[in-house]
Amino acid sequence: MRLNTLSPAAGAKHAPKRVGRGMGSGLGKTAGRGHKGQKSRSGGGVRPGFEGGQMPLKIRLPKFGFTSRRAMVTAEVRVLELAKVNGDVIDLNALKDANVITRNIQFAKIVLSGTIERPVTVKGLKVTKGARAAIEAAGGKIEE
C-alpha cells in the first residue's frame, strides 16, 4: 500500500452538484442564483460585515483596550514541560534549545500545570505561586 494509491471506498463520496448544465438537471439556466441582482452576477456579493449601507456594528460599538506588544513575545511554560529540558538550570535559552518555546520569544512565565519530579534551578524567568511551590517541593529553587 502506498499513499498515492489510497482512495475513498466506492460510494463514500458524492459528486459535487454541477450547476448550469441544462434544464433537466434542475440547476440549469440561472444555476440556483435566481434572477438578476448583485448576488447573481459573476464576482457579485458584499464583503463580510457589510450591512447594506447602514452603519456597521463594528463602527457603532466603541473602541476598547489595546493589544500588548509584549504579549506577542511572551510565552507561558507549564511545569510539566520543564522535564523536556536537559540539565539542571532552566533559563530562556535552555527552553529555546529544548524547543519548548520558539526563537522569537523574549519573556517566559512558568505556570502550574502538571508535576515535576527532578530538582531544577530556574533562572531569570517569572514563576507563579503554584509553580514556585511545585518546583520547591521537588527540591528545586528559583533565582531571579
UniProtKB/Swiss-Prot annotation:
It holds the Pfam family Ribosomal_L27A. InterPro entries: Ribosomal_uL15, Ribosomal_uL15/eL18, Ribosomal_uL15/eL18_sf, Ribosomal_uL15_bac-type, Ribosomal_uL15_CS. Residues 21-31, 42-52 have a biased composition (Gly residues). Part of the 50S ribosomal subunit. GO terms for molecular function: rRNA binding; structural constituent of ribosome. GO terms for cellular component: cytosolic large ribosomal subunit. Binds to the 23S rRNA. Residues 1-54 are annotated as: Disordered. Gene3D superfamilies: 3.100.10.10. SUPFAM superfamilies: Ribosomal proteins L15p and L18e. This is Large ribosomal subunit protein uL15. Belongs to the universal ribosomal protein uL15 family. GO terms for biological process: translation. The gene is rplO. Keywords: Ribonucleoprotein, Ribosomal protein, RNA-binding, rRNA-binding.
